[in-house]
Amino acid sequence: MAPKVAEKKPSLAGKAPAGKAPAEKKEAGKKTTTATGEKKKRTKARKETYSSYIYKVLKQTHPDTGISTRAMSIMNSFVNDIFERVATEASKLATYTKKSTITSREIQTAVRLILPGELAKHATGDGTRAVAKYSTFDN
């Protein structure tokens, strides 16, 4: 018996469905145009950092001292790490007490659990003072 010849079906790859025009692809990095036809640049995604706050604290404590970009990056990572640890611990504490809201009490307890000894005492004292100052502020 002779082998059967396979029939080739017409390929639909690369063809748009009937009645629809092919969609235009936007290339990355290209400028887009507004309704009036003028070109506008894409804005970069903003990265939030604690750099300005770290710099302000540095100038309060050591007015004549500067900080390098690399050191600022390390300090920013440090603040993010501590923030993440405190937030996670406070979330666990709220879950244990079956509450859906993290209050200053959970934050204070989380700080006491995470930070060692004297550092925890100073942090809770400064935090309590900051909350009191915020509470007395009038709009």
From Swiss-Prot:
SUPFAM superfamilies the UniProt entry points to: Histone-fold
Does Nuclease appear among the keywords?
no
- Where this protein primarily resides, as one coarse class? nucleus
Sorted UniProt keywords: Acetylation, Chromosome, DNA-binding, Isopeptide bond, Nucleosome core, Nucleus, Ubl conjugation
The family database entries (CDD domains) matched by this protein are listed as:
HFD_H2B
Q: Where is this cross-link: Glycyl lysine isopeptide (Lys-Gly) (interchain with G-Cter in ubiquitin)?
A: K133
Tell me the compartments it is located in.
Answer: Nucleus; Chromosome
Any one cellular component term from GO for this entry? site of double-strand break
Identify residues that carry N6-acetyllysine: K8, K9, K15, K25
MF terms per GO, please?
Answer: DNA binding; protein heterodimerization activity; structural constituent of chromatin
Q: How is it modified after translation?
A: Monoubiquitinated by the UBC2-BRE1 complex to form H2BK123ub1. H2BK123ub1 gives a specific tag for epigenetic transcriptional activation and is also prerequisite for H3K4me and H3K79me formation. H2BK123ub1 also modulates the formation of double-strand breaks during meiosis and is a prerequisite for DNA-damage checkpoint activation.
Q: Where is this cross-link: Glycyl lysine isopeptide (Lys-Gly) (interchain with G-Cter in SUMO)?
A: K8, K9, K25, K26
Disordered, as annotated region: 1-47
Question: Does the keyword field hold DNA-binding?
Answer: yes
Biased region (Basic and acidic residues) positions are: 1-10
Chain's role: Core component of nucleosome. Nucleosomes wrap and compact DNA into chromatin, limiting DNA accessibility to the cellular machineries which require DNA as a template. Histones thereby play a central role in transcription regulation, DNA repair, DNA replication and chromosomal stability. DNA accessibility is regulated via a complex set of post-translational modifications of histones, also called histone code, and nucleosome remodeling.
Q: Which family does it belong to?
A: Belongs to the histone H2B family.
Its quaternary structure? The nucleosome is a histone octamer containing two molecules each of H2A, H2B, H3 and H4 assembled in one H3-H4 heterotetramer and two H2A-H2B heterodimers. The octamer wraps approximately 147 bp of DNA.
Database matches in PANTHER family: HISTONE H2B
What is the name of this protein? Answer: Histone H2B
- What gene name is listed for this protein? HTB1
